[in-house]
Amino acid sequence: MDTIMKKNLIFLLSAALMVLATGCEKTSKGLTRITYYPVITLQGDNPYVVQLGEKYTEPGYTASLNGEDYTSNVQISSNVNSSVPGIYSVTYSATNPDGCSYSTTRDVYVLNPGGIANVYLSHCWMGSRNYENLPIVISPVSDGVYELEDLCGGFYCYGRYPGYEPTYDFHGEVQFSLNEDGSFNIKKIGDWYFRGSFDYNNITGGYDSETGIFDYNFDGLRVTLTPFTL
């Protein structure tokens, strides 16, 4: 290796080390040592299931920093509301002495067995594209009226174009009630990316009260929503 190449290599390695050590916060200017990030390990299930009306009880967690216990430095934030069916999150975060932080999240599913407002797993397909086990929530709005977070069953937001939100809204939200035969009575349509591409008058199928399953065809997009169970 010639002298110029050696000098370039030394410069690049030095620059990489500086980026690693100074990329946490501006006050670390001039720091030239390696910093260690906290590691957080969740105990219990993820997702964690709570029945409607039950209190969420923290299953536990541990944290370490360079092999040493760091659990007492973990901060927790949560939006869990066990009085409303849905998918919530508990976020665990910790910051090291250099200002470098790490976080991880536990999903909490609040289930409503036998109810229309519940957490579901979607199976959706159109043509050769087929996606399964996508989490979808139906929330209560008022007496007999519900909001389905995505009439497409996650086909676009989780299946075909994952990671594009929030830049693009691929959740086809609708508010609806059910007719006596279980079919949809669409009351409100959300303003999402492909709204103009679908005919909302062309929805066949619907809800089966005996199985608790939604099975329908939305203008050529087939969706089955099955209540989530462990």
Language-model-derived ranges and their functions:
Residues D2-K6, L12-N46:
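Bacterial Sec-dependent N-terminal signal peptides
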Residues S28-K29, S103-D107, N133-V137, E173:
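Well-ordered beta-strand positions in beta-sheet-rich domains
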Residues T35-Y37, Y109-N118:
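Extracellular interdomain linker/stem segments of modular secreted and single-pass surface proteins
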Residues Y36-E68, E132-L134, G153:
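Solvent-exposed, low-complexity, repeat-rich "mucin-like" stalks and linkers
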Residues V39, G60, S89-T91, T105, ...:
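Beta-strand secondary-structure signal
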Residues S64, S93-T95, S128:
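A generic structural motif
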Residues E68-R106, V110-L111:
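Serine/threonine-rich, repeat-prone extracellular segments and beta-strand-based repeat modules
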Residues G114-L230:
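Ser/Thr/Gly/Pro-rich, low-complexity flexible regions
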